Amino acid sequence: MRTAVSIFVVSAMALGSIIGGATAAPTPSASASAGPQKKVTSSLIKRPSGTLAPGSTVPASEIFGNRVFIDANRGYALVQHGQAQYPAATTDGGKTWKTNGPALHLNAAQAPLAVAFIGAGGKKKIFAWGGGQVIDATPDGGAHWYRATFTGLPVAVLKNPKGHLVAFVDGQTGASSVATQYVSKDGGKHWHLDNTVGGS
């Protein structure tokens, strides 16, 4: 049995051009000498007032970044609608798209929380990252989205062979950055430091 894994690894500098040149510097919440966070607990993302409700139809022209398909019909993407970014889903091979959760990012108000890429770890585990200090994830196909905020910048997120989400977070320790590996066994609600190869 062979397992294929796709990984996007993007530098913080490259993200600036991907998301329109508006990257914000991370907010330092721990000193470099304190070391990486041991655990990160996500918070539930609630729908901001004035934003689209989950299940709202959005045009394919509003999609930015990548699209991820888990089969011939079902896929996920990020859309920019007005001043907000949303996760979106299709069940007809990309002919129509609907929002698949609350607004993940409000452009002006949440610059450090931007997302630029979307990925899927199966039918239910969907995650977005890149451009800020967060990984937004849903363990249940979009019914609930959770935000994990890291002290560094997530540069890659993938699903390991055990079905767990694995994130590589840039520690931003100067010219020579070191990525720290975190694992979530519950679809993005809780992350823990894990330096084993591929995550346990």
Predicted regions and their residues:
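C-terminal region of N-terminal signal peptides and the immediate post-cleavage residues
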Residues: 15-36
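Entry beta-strands of beta-propeller and related beta-repeat scaffolds
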Residues: 72-77, 122-128, 163-167
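Trp- and S/T/G-rich repeat-edge/linker motifs of beta-rich repeat architectures
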Residues: 35-60, 95-106, 143-151, 189-199
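Short glycine/acidic-enriched loop and turn motifs that connect beta-strands
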Residues: 81-84, 172-175
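Beta-strand-rich domains and repeat architectures in extracellular enzymes and scaffolds
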Residues: 55-82
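Repeated scaffold domains used in trafficking and secretory/extracellular systems
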Residues: 62-67, 108-118, 152-160, 199-200
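Conserved Ser/Thr-centered positions that define the repeating blades of beta-propeller domains
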Residues: 90-91, 138-139, 184-185
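N-terminal export and membrane-targeting signals
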Residues: 1-10
